[in-house]
């Protein structure tokens, strides 16, 4: 059952008349923009659709002061859990990430408390649910994401392609993985692995994937190949599901290496990771 519109949308535009510029205003052309902050001053939609555990009612939650409307979210969920059914795409392309199976939905509120990572709202993808959030297949050349993993016991795929059986991961001490990397027929990763929140940068340069975390210089993962994505997290296989927290995923169909530093600075100014 859906309760319709959330209160957050009423307030989202009141705060951006004083010069607010979202990430997608500064860096236009994204094919996918999922975030718990407002990415575009012209976006008038919602942030997430949430199901509360107490009675399974659903509500769209918008933005307050250009951030997720936490007040409306917590008032709606109450003392139970809030599960994310839809993570709305702010790019204007309608590529909303969705999980309709209740048992596989990630969590934004647990026992009445907001899920946080580094002090900011986050969506928790706990292990053993074999869950993901699917969206329309999107071609990407550059990927930026903000996430953290909770365990090294599986390959933590933050983004996956069901059609191509390829993806991007945040680490996990399994199958030779040592940090951020890609699987495109073979597994390749950089060697900077920990459980801390990371800003990840993946960029396909036509030959290799250039990969970096937290504003560092890129490492080229050799013999890479470009591929589309259609899933936040990887479904159905426990040793490769994402076990962690996500806050932002932004994809571009065109190469964005010239904007790397400015993009990472914008994201870090919000999340204060490094």
Task: For the regions a language model picked out, list residue spans one by one.
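Extracellular glycan-interaction surfaces
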Residues: 37-39, 77-80, 85-128, 137, ...
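Intrinsically disordered, compositionally biased repeat/linker segments
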Residues: 1-2, 6-16
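Short, hydrophobic/proline-enriched secondary-structure or compact coil segments at domain edges
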Residues: 42-54, 123, 157-160, 229-231
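Extracellular, beta-strand-rich glycan-interacting domains
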Residues: 3-6, 42, 47-55, 63-65, ...
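Extracellular glycan-interaction patches encoded by glycine-rich segments
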Residues: 181-183, 187-188, 225-251
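Aromatic- and Gly/Pro-rich amphipathic surface segment
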Residues: 61-85
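Short, surface-exposed beta-strand/loop "edge" segments at domain boundaries and coil↔beta transitions
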Residues: 13, 50-62, 127-134, 164-170, ...
């Amino acid at each position: 059952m859906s309760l319709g519109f959330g209160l957050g949308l009423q307030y989202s535009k009141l705060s951006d008349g004083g010069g607010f510029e979202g990430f997608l205003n500064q860096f236009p052309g994204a094919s996918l923009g999922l975030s718990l902050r407002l990415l575009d001053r012209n976006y008038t939609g919602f942030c997430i659709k949430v199901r509360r555990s107490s009675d399974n009612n659903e509500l769209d939650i918008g933005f307050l002061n250009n951030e997720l409307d936490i007040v409306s979210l917590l008032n709606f969920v109450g003392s139970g859990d809030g599960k994310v059914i839809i993570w709305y795409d702010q790019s204007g392309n309608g590529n909303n990430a969705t999980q309709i199976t209740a048992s596989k939905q990630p969590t934004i509120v647990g026992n009445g408390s907001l899920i946080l990572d580094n002090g900011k709202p986050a969506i928790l993808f706990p292990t053993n649910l074999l869950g993901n959030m699917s969206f329309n297949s999107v071609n990407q050349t550059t990927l930026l994401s903000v996430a953290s993993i909770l365990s090294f016991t599986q390959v933590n795929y933050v983004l996956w392609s069901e059609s191509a059986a390829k993806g991007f991961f945040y680490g996990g001490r399994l199958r030779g993985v040592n940090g951020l990397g890609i699987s495109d027929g073979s597994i390749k990763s950089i060697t900077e692995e920990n459980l801390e929140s990371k800003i990840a940068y993946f960029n396909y340069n036509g030959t290799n994937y250039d990969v970096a975390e937290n504003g560092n210089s890129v490492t080229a993962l050799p013999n890479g190949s470009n591929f589309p994505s259609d899933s936040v997290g990887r479904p159905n296989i426990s040793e490769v599901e994402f076990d962690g927290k996500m806050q932002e995923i932004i994809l571009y169909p065109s190469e964005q290496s010239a904007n790397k530093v400015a993009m990472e600075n914008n994201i870090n100014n919000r999340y204060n990771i490094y």
